[in-house]
Amino acid sequence: MERIIVKGAPGSPYTRKMLSLLRYRRLPYNFLVGGLFDEGIMDTSHLPKAKVNLMPTIYFKNKLDNLEPMVDSTFIIRRLENLFKERSVVPKSPILKFLDYLLEDFADEWLTKATFHYRWNYEKDILKAGSTLSRWRSLTYDEEKIKPIRDNISERQISRLHVVGSNKN
């Protein structure tokens, strides 16, 4: 069985979700730590770019045997279900399948609001999250080198709080 290529970040809830699913289903994969701020860290130039740069990006071979990026975890799960029958995560019962989809959609859309809010709304949390996220690929960087990376990540995430529905209330 060919290994599935997963590009993501360790702290991304969706990346964690997909890695957990792949491990549960015992599907072999290669995990590439990547994202918006990985210039010069890991060469992913051979991989096609997704239309929307989200994490994780999973690469599937298409009918022409070319890699094709996919970013929505719900649709990735469905595609994996079609490709691999062992250790399915989608119930066979139509009622349970509907409830499974409903719960997954709820978690995808609503739990991320809390994740974003508590990572990026309060000063101490912003510093902690920015420092942690910026060091995944730069463990040996000193403060002078890490600060612009941390600031860039923090500014981007804070600017997106409204997208996930987080606000001061």
Report residues per predicted region.
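GST-like domain detector, emphasizing the conserved glutathione-binding G-site
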Residues: 1-144
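A conserved mid-domain beta-alpha-beta active-site/ligand-binding segment of alpha/beta enzyme cores
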Residues: 144-169
